[in-house]
Regions:
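N-terminal non-catalytic structural scaffold regions of very large proteins
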Residues: 1-268
């Protein structure tokens, strides 16, 4: 696999024009999200990540994450004069002037034709869960919504995400200015080898999630039919077992990975 949580740069061709791209595979607790910052044909920065159809304007997304002023956004990217020139063009194209308007811009992209309250909640949920999820480790584990300090913790994580996006934008501009080369995806420094422990961790997580969904389905079906709820009938033993044994036997692991090329004979001699 490509290294997680590491900024990588590359070129792409679109409509016979070169697009400069900085991307990162952000991974946290088994969830892996591709976040891309690119400089489009109009020389404007755009961001894409899971759950968002299309692209979001970079500056407006930064405002949604808590950087309200243009000065703060520029500081998060770079103080270099050449990069500042590029950033001025992005600032002029921005349509948001506050954190609230930035969140509503994201919400309208995610849930068009919905109520403002729903759009705001949806935008905050996506920003907190799908944008750069590896930075969510900064959030205290036992802190819940409504607890003292929860709002401050959420805001600090969003600011961390904004500054990480700033680093990605700087990498993109450095590529434009020939200050850095594109990253070699085949170089060993950009690769990570998943061994048995990592594969088993991913496999067990997915298998357990499937088991819990199956238990929920069995209990809901029994409840609808007014039957007595029984753990023996709700928990099917083969769901977890078969899900674990099949990849071990065939080598077809989760995520399309392949390993062992033949069936293993499990005879204990």
């Amino acid at each position: 696999d490509l290294a997680s949580n590491k900024i990588m740069t590359e070129f792409t061709e679109r409509y016979n024009e070169r697009i400069y791209v900085a991307k990162v595979f952000s991974q946290f607790r088994g969830y892996r999200a591709l976040v891309v910052v690119e400089r489009n044909r109009k020389n404007l920065l755009e961001v894409s990540f899971p759950s968002v159809a299309g692209h979001l304007r970079f500056v407006d997304l930064m405002k949604a994450l808590g950087l309200a002023s243009d000065h703060d956004i520029v500081e998060a990217v770079s103080t270099d004069e050449e990069i500042l020139t590029f950033m001025m063009q992005n600032l002029e194209e921005s349509e948001c002037d506050s954190v609230e308007s930035g969140i509503m811009y994201v919400g309208k992209k995610l849930a068009p034709n919905q109520t403002r309250d729903y759009q705001k909640k949806r935008a905050e949920f996506v920003l907190d869960n799908y944008l750069l999820p590896h930075l969510n480790y900064l959030m205290p584990a036992n802190l819940k919504e409504g607890d003292p300090g929860y709002r401050a913790a959420v805001d600090s994580v969003r600011l961390a995400k904004a500054h990480f996006l700033g680093r990605m934008a700087e990498s993109c501009f450095d590529l434009v200015l020939n200050r850095r080369r594109i990253d070699d995806k085949d170089h060993y420094a950009n690769k990570r080898l998943k061994l048995a422990g990592d594969l088993m961790e991913d496999l067990f997580r997915i298998s357990l999630n499937r088991l819990t969904r199956d238990i929920k389905y069995q209990l809901e079906r029994a409840s609808m039919r007014h039957r007595d709820l029984s753990i023996a009938t709700a928990v099917r033993a083969d769901v977890l077992t078969e899900r674990l044994l099949h990849p071990l036997a065939t080598g077809n692991w989760v995520g399309g990975r392949t390993g062992v090329s033949q069936l293993l004979d499990r005879v204990d001699h």
